[in-house]
Amino acid sequence: MKPLLAMSALLIIFGLLFSSLTLFAQDDSLYSFEVEEFTKKTWEWKSELTVAGASKTFNQDSVLYPFKFQQDQQTKAQDLSLQIPLESRWDWEWSRLYFVGEFRITGSSLSDTIEQTAVLQEAYWQLSTLDPHSIESGKRLLRWGKGYAFNPVALLERSKDPENPEAAREGLWMVQGILIPGTLSGLDSNSLTLVYLPVRSGINGDYQANLEQEDIWGLKLSALLGTTDFDLYLTRWSEKAETDWGFDFASNLSSNFEMHGEYAEDTDLSNKYTKSLLGIRYLTDNEITWTIEGYHDTSGWTKDESTEIYKTIESGSSVAAKTALTELQSKQIVSQDYAYVKASLKEPFDWLYFTPSLTWLGNLADQSFNVITQLNYAPVTDWSFQLSWQQLSGDAYTQYGENLLGNK
């Protein structure tokens, strides 16, 4: 507990220091005018400080609980974290350089140690003399797809976490070329993107399990027809002689109603898996934004298959249980069918800068679900406060019913 208390004091000091600097900066900006603020800068950067505390309650009925707490039984845990994300950009007449990273300090009541991690999420160079065309080289996050909580066409990037789809993701080292030829017959705009992504022990080695060496080539064709965006994706894996493809679309049916979808085919040795997504975004007259998505993945387990996995873990057989546990932990998407619903209300009761939201993530196969309630308040510039509550629920041998976390 001593490291956790020390970290608490450190977070408070950081918060007070950051608050003082922000207030002084705001006071000075009220009566200052700098011409340089309106001229293009060679170097620009922005950062923020996030201090978060969490209280967790563990699900002692979960079949995973004995593996996590074999000797010391725990029912609750308190976590503290400090995050400092940084974005930086250098501009020259002929090129640009981008850096995106994050430094994090975390501590937990379950451990006597404080962890420090630094992640370089993006770092790439861009040749700017070819505008509107582009050549980029370095660590890049492509952000393919139109989905919010899921991204089936993320063929050359790390998948989103549907429980926190807005979380920062780490990019991959690659070379990318973008060609924008202009409008073609019947199309308002179009573009062609070519990607080369190498996989070696020291380059993108953690991209996929059991992948030591590979050369992956990617192609993206984009077009705009009226108010509808279309994208076609194609990837070729040289060593595995595998070709994957997919497409997506997004269409504004009206000023407050949008529909989007994705489809991808992923070939794995002798198997072919498909992933699909269909979703909408709708803004009501009373400022409620609805985001609804349905997701299907044939590589996921059926209800019977997942039930068998949980029963095997529960059996406690040293070899079989550990094998099943490893297989479960390696899958971000466990089952085949999910639904995602989020409702966000802007400034209810005329409460300025206050936005509550409610999210429901459900496993349609086993009827278990995860509910996240968030309250966001940003009363002044550069300050934001968030309070959230997460509750997982489900029967025995279901994804969220057997989750180690009960609520947070």
Report each predicted region and the residues it spans.
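Residues on the lipid-exposed face of transmembrane beta-strands in outer-membrane beta-barrel proteins
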Residues: 82-90, 122-127, 175-179, 219-223, ...
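Repeated loop/turn-to-beta-strand initiation elements of outer-membrane beta-barrel proteins
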Residues: 93-99, 132-135, 184-190, 225-232, ...
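Outer-membrane beta-barrel translocator/channel fold
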Residues: 52-71, 138-150, 162, 168, ...
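Residues that define the transmembrane beta-barrel architecture of outer-membrane proteins
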Residues: 74-82, 116-121, 169-175, 213-217, ...
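Beta-barrel outer-membrane channel/assembly domains of diderm bacteria
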Residues: 26-135, 375, 385-388, 408
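Outer membrane beta-barrel
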Residues: 88-197, 394
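Transmembrane beta-strands of outer-membrane beta-barrel pores
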Residues: 51-59, 90-94, 103-107, 141-143, ...
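Membrane-embedded beta-strand positions of outer-membrane beta-barrel proteins
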Residues: 47-49, 99-101, 137, 177, ...
